[in-house]
Amino acid sequence: MTTIVSVRRNGKVVMGGDGQVSLGNTVMKGNAKKVRRLYHGQVIAGFAGATADAFTLFERFEGQLEKHQGHLVRAAVELAKEWRTDRSLSRLEAMLAVANKDASLIITGNGDVVEPEDGLIAMGSGGAYAQAAARALLNKTDLSAREIAETALNIAGDICVFTNHNLTIEEQDLAD
């Protein structure tokens, strides 16, 4: 699996993920890019779960973004509906985290679209560790969104055997 973290703070949204791809108990790749930009660089997206499934979902989500002129919530809801009702999509095992200047969302294969109330997303095999670390740092420090995401991912990488320290971080100003 993997760990994806997204943090909103002080006019920035940051999303990061580790680079480990595992097949069972074997590390197959250590430098995968699980966080990327979509829709003309205006949306940051990350995935946890089966890699091939996630790429299919990225393509479908980007199609929904194009169809709805980059409106993140509308595109996410439409993807979730499609994911829930399309037989081939309903078998996909992945989750998406997506963020832009307006919102941060988790999209699940059950058709859920969740906007966390504190702007913090942490998912994947190391998600609980990363969430605990990020929440503590958000509440007790003045660190930047990027510093919080990096620290949370590194803590998850120290604890979770399916998460490594080869990080991809994307950052966007909320004013853009």
Swiss-Prot record:
Say which family it is in: Belongs to the peptidase T1B family. HslV subfamily.
The entry summarizes how activity is regulated as: Allosterically activated by HslU binding.
Return one GO MF term.
Answer: metal ion binding
Q: How does it assemble?
A: A double ring-shaped homohexamer of HslV is capped on each side by a ring-shaped HslU homohexamer. The assembly of the HslU/HslV complex is dependent on binding of ATP.
Name recorded for this polypeptide? ATP-dependent protease subunit HslV
- Database matches in NCBIfam families: ATP_dep_HslV, PRK05456.1
Enumerate the transmembrane spans: none
Can you tell me which residues form the catalytic site?
A: 2
Instruction: Give the UniProt keywords, A-Z.
Output: Allosteric enzyme, Cytoplasm, Hydrolase, Metal-binding, Protease, Sodium, Threonine protease
Q: Enzyme class, one word?
A: hydrolase
Which E.C. number(s) belong to this protein?
A: 3.4.25.2
Residues reported to bind Na(+): 157, 160, 163
Catalysis: reaction(s): ATP-dependent cleavage of peptide bonds with broad specificity
Q: Mention one GO biological process in which this protein takes part, according to its record.
A: proteolysis involved in protein catabolic process
What the protein does comes down to: Protease subunit of a proteasome-like degradation complex believed to be a general protein degrading machinery.
Point out the signal peptide segment: none
Q: Name one Pfam family in it.
A: Proteasome
The cross-references to CDD domains, in alphabetical order and at most eight, read:
protease_HslV
Could you tell me where this protein is found in the cell? Answer: Cytoplasm
Instruction: Please tell me one Gene Ontology term that the record gives under cellular component.
Output: proteasome core complex
